[in-house]
Amino acid sequence: MEEKVILVDENDQPIGLMEKLEAHQKGLLHRAFSVFIINSKGEILLQQRALSKYHSPGLWTNTCCSHQRQGEDNLQAGKRRLWEEMGMQVPLKQVFSFIYEAPMGNGLTEHEYDYVLIGFSDESPSINPLEVCNWKWATPEQIQKSIAETPEEYTAWFKIIFDKFYHFIAENITL
């Protein structure tokens, strides 16, 4: 089954559906979400993408991210993928959204209207090896330092999203 993404305008109004790979090849704006799980120590759960992924294999990124299905709201989509990728069931809250564009250097471009979702858990994930090859907890400061020192180890979108998320948690969350 081909996975379709929801094409949107800059106001997040749906304008059509397209196969995911084609949307990434054409760099068309589509709806997406990014989940961040934080533990009681203030650490963020990161995943290393499976080596079999068609883009950004083996790179580190946020807890999980994907695309909403037609008729699915952001929180439903986030919970679905958090379970499918990380084997976790965690209440999520939508905290902000923004548009970004990130060429991935292989003829593909992420151009997303991204909803950032947050959840809190001390649970260890039970990863799906088709999606994820490794995971770790890291403080925001450790992540920021690692991105600065080894940016090639992180997905293009995570580097953009993390900067916004870092400022959000610094201003809004007491850990």
Task: Please identify what each model-predicted range represents.
Residues 22-33, 40-80:
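Conserved Nudix-box catalytic region and its N-terminal flanking loop in Nudix hydrolases
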Residues 35, 64, 94, 115-117:
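A structural signal for short, well-ordered beta-strand segments
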Residues 5, 43-44, 135-136:
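A residue-level structural signature of the nucleotidyltransferase/glycosyltransferase Rossmann-like core
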Residues 21, 58, 96-101, 108-175:
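Nudix hydrolase/Nudix homology domain
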Residues 1-34, 40:
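Acidic, metal-coordinating catalytic segment for phosphate/diphosphate chemistry
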Residues 89-97:
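A short coil-to-beta-strand element that immediately follows conserved catalytic motifs
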Residues 85:
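Short alpha-helical functional segments enriched in proximate histidine and acidic residues
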